Amino acid sequence: KDFEKNAGTPMIFWGVIVLLFSLAVWMLLILTGKLEWNFLWFGIPVIGWPLYPMVVKGRCKSGGKSFISRSIGQIWLAYGIFATVLAGVFAFIAPHLTGYLTVALLGYAAVMTGFALKNNYITAGGFITGLGCTVALFFFEKEFSPLCVAVASILNLIVPGIMMNRRAK
């Protein structure tokens, strides 16, 4: 029970942002067929970081003071930095690999979160995303890869965030 009230709120916030961008990119790819819409992914940190303090402010009771809360925050901060920087690099040197990398990193961060929380659902969801969704991307048309990211955001961010908030009550 090493949780602050609403400790999962940041995960829910970022999960919703990722889900909305995933659906937007997917719809635009389907409607236009232009892969340039993939650059919208960079809108996640551009929109998310300024909105984050406004949306989450005051909802996390003690600001993540426990070891577990700090560790989980650091896991996801590292994911955000790695995913943003590497996606930026890959967009120019190997754009076809960006989705695989991002989904694999998302799964890895979720697995680490599950291990830290000793939560088998979150751990399993991370493995499904990191391994299953990454492999599945090889079989989907490029236009459908954002749907893997949408599923991953629900499985690895939104649902675990809700679980964490309920566990803290």
Segments from the language model and where they lie:
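Selected alpha-helical membrane-embedding segments in polytopic membrane proteins
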Residues: 2-90
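Hydrophobic residues within membrane-embedded alpha-helical segments of Major Facilitator Superfamily
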Residues: 11, 17-18, 24, 48, ...
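C-terminal ends of transmembrane helices
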Residues: 51-67, 110-115, 158-167
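Membrane-proximal helix-loop-helix units in multi-pass membrane proteins
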Residues: 67-127
